[in-house]
From Swiss-Prot:
Low complexity bias: start-end ranges: 78-87
Any matching Pfam family: RRP36
UniProt protein name: rRNA biogenesis protein RRP36
Biological function: Component of the 90S pre-ribosome involved in the maturation of rRNAs. Required for early cleavages of the pre-RNAs in the 40S ribosomal subunit maturation pathway.
Subcellular location: Nucleus, Nucleolus
Domain of life: Eukaryota
Main location per the UniProt record: nucleus
Stretches the record annotates as Disordered: 1-167, 312-345
Biased composition (Basic and acidic residues): 312-322, 330-345
Coiled coil: 219-267
KW Cell inner membrane (keyword) present: no
Assembly and interaction partners: Associates with 90S and pre-40S pre-ribosomal particles.
Length: 345
């Protein structure tokens, strides 16, 4: 055995301090040679040693004890310490190379089995580790991405690309729901009623408005008649519950008809503002003061309509309009205030 041979070579008569350094150097060199030879032969003799170790354990046990027992009395403590240190290093190297590598190969064979050869064993192990790490990184759970909300209600909605598409198909389209329409104000009917004149067909809405302008006069007369009925019911001496309900209904009808009348008047004023602006732009282009016309925006048209209405109002109407405007602005500001400050003026 190599342990007994090394110990027998070192056993000598007790040396002096000067000669002890020389002997220790020789022992270290012998240990290094033995380690080199053992490391070179481990790969070739692993299979043979595994078979013969079990058979020779009993025979070698008696011989080792007989060889070591008489020599232990003459070995110095320094030599034993060096031998123990050398054996400890050898054990660490063997465990690091023999115990860890099969575990790594087992893990790699489970996760990503790849064929390996004896010549490129270390290279395959390093490559397997990197592939194993990549596999773990790819299979790691990614945090779910939260869909951000829309910046405004007019912005398009955000939807994941993984959203499943519906498997249902519309084989038969549903029937179109019939919508009622008034033929008096339909552009198709009005275009046919102009006797094929293209100028009048293009301005069918204007002609319809002019043809049915008497309806607005009827509406004003109806509002006046409803107000008379409300005043008659209010001045009635003995009013019943039915009369109260009738007054509420008539007032609601008056407000709806008056709102409709005001909306019609506002549209007429907007149309007049646009017509006047187009005339001015045409005159400026005809005079050569402009090369391209300027088209009013909706906000500009609205401001001009308000200014025109304000100039046409009387003194009392202006005060009422300003008071309504003031209350409207005050209500908006009160809504923006905190709840505790709303009641404080």
């Amino acid at each position: 055995m190599p342990i007994s041979s090394t110990l027998n070579q070192r056993v000598r008569a007790r040396l002096e301090d000067d000669d002890f350094g020389h002997v220790s150097d020789e022992s270290v060199s012998n240990e290094a040679l033995d380690e080199g030879e053992s490391n070179e032969d481990t790969e070739q003799d692993n299979s043979d040693q595994r078979e013969t170790d079990d058979d020779d354990t009993e025979d070698d046990g008696h011989t080792e004890i007989s060889d070591i027992n008489p020599s232990l009395n003459t070995i110095s403590f320094g030599a034993l310490a060096k031998a123990q240190a050398a054996l400890g290093k050898r054990k660490r190297r063997t465990t690091s190379t023999t115990d860890i590598t099969p575990k790594r190969t087992k893990v790699l064979s489970r996760q990503s089995p790849t064929p390996s050869t004896s010549s490129n064993k270390e290279h395959d192990q390093g490559q397997g580790l990197s592939e194993f790490q990549k596999h773990l990184a790819s299979n790691a759970k990614k945090p779910p991405q939260k869909l951000t909300h829309r910046t405004s209600k007019h912005a398009p909605t955000i939807q994941s690309s993984r959203h499943a598409v519906s498997r249902k198909r519309t084989i038969l389209e549903p029937l179109a729901v019939p919508k009622p329409r008034d033929p008096r104000f339909d552009s198709v009917v009005l275009s046919h009623s102009t006797n094929g004149d293209p100028s009048t067909a293009a301005n069918a809405d204007i002609h319809a408005r002019n043809n049915y302008a008497f309806l607005n006069h009827y509406r004003t007369d109806e509002i006046a008649e409803l107000r008379k009925q409300v005043s008659a019911l209010q001045t009635k001496k003995k009013k019943t519950e039915r009369d109260d309900h009738e007054i509420v209904r008539l007032k609601r009808e008056i407000t709806s008809m008056s709102d409709r009348q005001r909306a019609f008047e506002r549209k007429e004023m907007e149309r007049e503002v646009l017509v006047q602006h187009r005339r001015r732009e045409k005159e400026l282009i005809r005079e050569g003061k402009k090369s391209q016309p300027y088209f009013l925006k909706k906000g500009e048209v609205k401001r001009e309509v308000i200014a025109k209405r304000f100039t046409e109002m009387s003194g009392k109407e202006k005060q009422r309009a300003l008071e309504r405007r003031r209350k409207k602005v005050a209500g908006k500001e009160r809504k923006e205030m905190p709840w505790g400050r709303r009641g404080v003026e």
